[in-house]
């Protein structure tokens, strides 16, 4: 039963704490960040791994091209500890496409005070397969930091390892899948116990010919934030939460 508590605890957290943005603005929205468009819309020529979002995207064609480059001065240098293995890099590119292009992250957007963005996402429930496969693909590649959000040497215009940060394998810095997915970007993601196709977790990878599965996921979580309630069925799954949930549920 413990695995079933994760989405419910997340829902309770979201209902009680709210979000960093207006509760009426949770669906089909873009973050206020460096490369994001102000509103999502079609981008027919999105590059390669970002193409699944072409029907409705928060990223531009140029951003989608730049984030695929190893030496982009617009984006991030993946090869800061030697050349990253292609299988590993593909997961980082997919992560970047989700971050830049997805209009389905509204419930997890938080306000921040940073020079390059005013908003970020926090604790997005990432499908467990996406996290595990990311870690498996990268465990033998090299990096020098556990938190990639801060602490880089940007003096050359691209991110380089500081002198105090030696290069080791990903598995050295991230011994478990969760330590990678949750720690890498300062808890942007929270590894879900749910699988792809469940409608309860965000997918990095999906077949766009079958539609975007994250649209249903964001609607599910947004519905609780806008209504401020949790269904009676949830109480049956987690009896220990009943005293708390009963405060919100109608009689």
Swiss-Prot record:
Residues holding folate: 95, 99, 116-120, 149-154, 188
Keyword set, alphabetical order: Cell membrane, Disulfide bond, Folate-binding, Glycoprotein, GPI-anchor, Lipoprotein, Membrane, Receptor, Signal, Transport
Signal peptide, first to last residue: 1-20
Database matches in InterPro entries: Folate_rcpt, Folate_rcpt-like
Molecular-function GO terms, alphabetical: folic acid binding; folic acid receptor activity
Residues bearing glycans: 62, 193
Disruption phenotype: No visible phenotype.
Bilayer disposition of the protein: Lipid-anchor; GPI-anchor
Primary subcellular site in the record, as a coarse category: membrane
Family: Belongs to the folate receptor family.
Protein name per its UniProtKB record: Folate receptor beta
Protein's gene: Folr2
